[in-house]
Amino acid sequence: FTDWNQSVVNEKVYTVALVGIAVISWLMIRWSDDPDGPKADRILVLVAYLSSLGYGVHMAGMLAAPAVAVAVLVRRPRTLLRWRLLLAIAGALVLGLTPFATQPIRAAYNPPIDEGEPTACRNGLHLSCTFSSGTYDAFMYNFNRGQYGKPALDQRQAPFTGQIGMWWYYFKWQWMRDPFNQNPAMQSILAAVFFVLGAFGAWVHFQRERRSFWYFGTYMFTTTLLLIYYLNFKYGATQPVTGDVAREVRDRDYFFLWSFSAWGVWAALGLVFIWESVASFFGTERTKLGKDLITLPTDQALKFGSPILLIAIIPLFTNWQWAPRSGQTDTRDFAHDLLDSVEPYGVLVTVGDNDTFPLWYAQEVEGIRRDVIDANTSLLNTDWYGRQLLRRPVYDYDEAKGPAVYRGKQWEKPKGPPLNMSLSDIDAIPEAEQLPNRMAFDAGGLHAILDPDSLEEGYLQRADILVLRMIKDAWPARPVYFSRTSGDYPSRTLGLAKYLIEQGLASKVIMPPAKPTPDTVWMPPNPFRGEGEWMDVQRSKELWLHDFTAPASLIRRGSWIDEPSKGIPYLYVITGGDLIGALRTVHDTADAQHAFATMMGVAHMIRMDGPGVIPPLNSGFWEQGMLAGPPPAVAATRGDSAHGPKSSDTRAGVVLHDTGPKKRPPARPGR
């Protein structure tokens, strides 16, 4: 059982890899029964092929390899001395890895989604660049997962005991998922029962079928203690740990499904052992097994003892409520809503997986709002994503399929990408640039202050430079938006606080209005919203009430059990609250009531509607401090007159103006 159920990766990757391991395990048990049989060598060659083929699906495809080696060493070590068999196994391993060869070939054709870009070819597939050191280096970087930068194994990200505790925490989920901690005692009891059953099963396996135990026992060791040590995870995202500790961004329970599934086999053996033991009280008989006579329960006795087998179906009932996903369209609907929050041909800046991968699916599979460019800041920090933005074609906006609020207007199709740069210009952008002091960024009348104290150790990241460059090159002719999932990134990191207006689930870069309008409301900071900003009341109302589809699907879903991804439904609570306050400020009470009911439905789904959590509609909280017009102007100083005019600094085509000396911390070591 896993609750990472907003991702089809579970079915398309982990489950497929698990099927491969299951087939390998079945083959090795057959081989262990008859290692000198006529098909024994063929089985080993097939196992080698399936292992490397499974590696192409997921690295876990090789998890059975140590167990295969131990089984061969224990059962028939002389097998390792037969060079023809070893050559056949080596050939099978290479053959199974050949699907990897498609990666640089595919990448050379610049597909819409090409993570890692494992090729040195920049203008199509050619032999000279495909068979080059550049392609080899790019491919091996992907193959070895270099982008993740895991520390050395002797640098533990959490104590090994804590990492084992993470395994146990997720082990308990398999027998009874208790997402809201309502029955912790029962969950622990069931986990203990199935743990003991598995331990009994391991003992029974060792006693009765030692030939296959060497394979299965080694596999279990590999997928538990050895894998836990190798993965070297931080504490789990929701693992109960006291104190402020480093945690994974999501619960990594799916990395241990290999051991959980295998433990289920041992638990089944243990349950059968208990069934036979109980049945023996109702009658036994002597049965010949090979040359030996053994005592077994009679058929009638087994029937009397069979109710004990009902233990096996307990997890089916305890997890049924949380496991099915039929009718869950909220992830797709969220992508639809976020894309529709952006005007035609807009650039949407996102920050992570949850606000990017659903958008890719919606655009590339369902063809939803392909005119919008999704610029992910995490990926913009890589050396390849910027090139993909340059190559991405400008897709036509389909007015008939777009929101009604955009119809009847002329939307000029851009002639090129949002970056006025060449591929070599993109490649020349540094990984990071240190700001010596406060700098001003100017573009199309916009004047933003970049403060080193608001940057990571005073450095402007590659992604920050590219986002500023997109504003400089494309805005205001092309709309630029920041997803509301980006938090205070545009306001704090890029200094754009007063240049943002909320429209649906995104904030658009604008020139702040000079006078009040009926549709423009200033929203001050509050505990739900965080930073203050403008709201386009009419646009947000039309999107919320007539276009958004996720609130209804979230309410229909009924509950949200994955705590780390709760930010998606929570986003609807935040933006709903903003809209409610704005509508009440402009005295649109009927629509405010409608929006409040929808927001409370989503809040109930994530259990955020308890007493005192969300203020009542008529409490005055939502419209508190809102102004139907601009807030007091805040002067943005362009220079310190006491020091005279300041110099300009050009960084990757982004002109920054020095606003005055400011003491900085010493430069950090090379990145």
What are these language model-derived features?
Residues 3, 20-23, 226:
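Transmembrane-helix signature of multi-pass solute transporters
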Residues 8-18, 30-47, 51-252, 256-345, ...:
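ER/secretory pathway lumenal C-terminal domains and tails of membrane proteins involved
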Residues 353:
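Acidic-and-aromatic substrate-binding clefts and catalytic sites of carbohydrate-active enzymes
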Residues 26:
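Short, small/polar-rich loop/turn modules that mediate ligand/substrate recognition or access, typified
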Residues 659-671:
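Short Lys/Arg-rich cationic patches that frequently serve as NLS/NoLS or arginine-rich RNA/DNA-binding motifs
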Residues 1-7:
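Short intrinsically disordered, low-complexity coil segments enriched in acidic
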